Amino acid sequence: FGSVAPGGYAWVFPKESVSNIGLGVQRKMSKGRSLESYANEFIERYEGEESFRGAGYLPMSGTIGQFVKGNYVLVGDSAGMVLPSNGAGITIAMIGGRIAGQVISEHINNGVDLQEYQSRWEAQMGEVMRNSKRSFTIGSLLFRFPDWFLNIAFNPFTRGFIWRAVTCRKMFWVF
């Protein structure tokens, strides 16, 4: 984990005759190296023709404090709707877009306050985002350990705990 993608993760998803290969890193754990340098090093381990190469950054700190200002609403990456624990954002943005669209329609037709968008978002996604942020924080601490330690720590006995963290559920029954 740490040597390939510090504070993040790497993936190889086979798709018929091609593969999606990539990684995510935490900038503060990257030791001054660029995302591109980590990506190049990882991708070059695999054979085959390259059809696309790109790199970008995600807002991994969770949602911003205010989605609505006046008649403007923010959705998706602009509102920080990316799960800090795993970088997932498409589904989260779609949920935000659906809620925003409903509230905007109600605002136009019935005068509903646009702030209702943030209230509904919190009601539907607030716990998921909080759990994801907690998982990210714990993961950030764990990923400071060397790879050999992580290989021991991530084992069949901890699988359930890790799965709960990655899927943004409460990792412990206490909090």
How should these model regions be labeled?
Residues 102-175:
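C-terminal helical "tail/cap" subdomain of flavin- and related membrane-associated enzymes
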Residues 6, 27-104, 109:
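FAD/FMN-dependent oxidoreductases across multiple families
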Residues 1-35:
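Conserved FAD-binding catalytic core of PHBH/FMO-like flavoproteins
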